[in-house]
A protein has these predicted regions:
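C-terminal capping alpha-helices of c-type cytochrome domains
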Residues: 104-150
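Electrostatic cytochrome c docking/interface patches
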Residues: 30-55
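Signal peptide processing junction and immediate N-terminal pro/mature segment
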Residues: 23-31
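Short, solvent-exposed loop/turn segments at the edges of secondary structure
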Residues: 12-13, 72, 121
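N-terminal secretory signal peptides that target proteins for export/translocation
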Residues: 1-10
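Gly/Gly-Pro-rich "capping" loops immediately C-terminal to redox-active cysteine motifs
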Residues: 49-53, 64-106, 128-130
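The canonical Cys-X-X-Cys-His
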Residues: 52, 56-65, 140, 144
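Bacterial N-terminal signal peptides
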Residues: 13-24
Length: 150
């Protein structure tokens, strides 16, 4: 058969639209529909500390949770619970916004902070955009809860 004389394949607009809709509906059918996040207490009770350590890998550029590790680009996270934000001794780079916030770190406050650091305290200097996944935040917080005085 001579390829030079083959007529181009033609599709009707309706056939193209049907094909496009089938592809789009198939693609979106596999994606879960996000619902409201479970309450923090439920997420924390189901937290995976091992995954929290993995999630903390994103934070390690600026923070260390280990006792005696000191500060990096961000303050040490050792024994952060119950401490007023912006008051870690030896860390000089807190934003005025964080110092003025007067918030005290708790697991619930950290969950809200990590959901949207820039929106939670506008003007703070944290480089990260946070941890958008609610369960990953709970996993991370459960991991960080290990790093405190007993």
């Amino acid at each position: 058969m001579n390829q030079a004389h083959r007529a181009p394949m033609a599709f009707s607009p309706a056939a193209l639209l049907a094909l496009l809709l089938a592809l789009v509906s198939h693609t979106h059918a596999a994606e879960p529909v996000p619902g409201p996040a479970k309450p923090f207490a439920e997420r924390l009770a189901a937290a995976d500390v091992v995954n929290g350590r993995v999630v903390f890998g994103r934070c390690r550029t600026c923070h260390y949770p280990d006792k005696g590790a000191g500060h990096q680009n961000g303050p040490s996270l050792w024994n952060v619970w119950g401490r007023q934000a912006g008051t870690q001794e030896g860390f000089a780079y807190y934003s005025q916004a964080l110092k003025d916030s007067r918030l005290v770190w708790s697991p619930e406050i950290l969950d809200a902070w990590l959901a949207d650091p820039r929106g939670f305290i506008p003007g703070n200097m944290m480089m990260s955009l946070g941890v958008p996944d609610p369960q990953e935040r709970a996993d991370l917080i459960a991991y960080l809860m290990q790093f405190r005085e007993q």
